[in-house]
Amino acid sequence: MQKSEGFRSKTRYKLQKHPRQKGMAPLTRALKCYTEGDRVHVVLDPSVQKGMPHPKFHGKTGVIVAQRGRSFLVRVKDGGKYKDIIARPQHLRESKL
């Protein structure tokens, strides 16, 4: 049988929660607002499928470029190029630096 290459393939451990973090995230995380120029980390929340960027961007740091509806446009460096990804606030964490 041919191997499946879906959107969430090879993410067995990447999209896994620890037992104490299981369930839905706090509502304030979904209502978080960012402004242009904010530095954010892309940390995927597997309990929310909407607005989830591709798993290869998990753990990357980027800059907010614009807001698109409820989502944000984040510029992330991937190899030697900059790529713009669209992600909801549930999958973003504010950078402390």
UniProtKB/Swiss-Prot annotation:
Residues 1-26 are annotated as: Disordered. InterPro entries: Ribosomal_eL21, Ribosomal_eL21_arc, Ribosomal_eL21_CS, Ribosomal_eL21_sf, Translation_prot_SH3-like_sf. Gene3D superfamilies: Ribosomal protein L21 (2.30.30.70). Keywords: Ribonucleoprotein, Ribosomal protein. Pfam families: Ribosomal_L21e (PF01157). Belongs to the eukaryotic ribosomal protein eL21 family. This is Large ribosomal subunit protein eL21. It comes from Methanococcus maripaludis (strain C5 / ATCC BAA-1333). The gene is rpl21e.
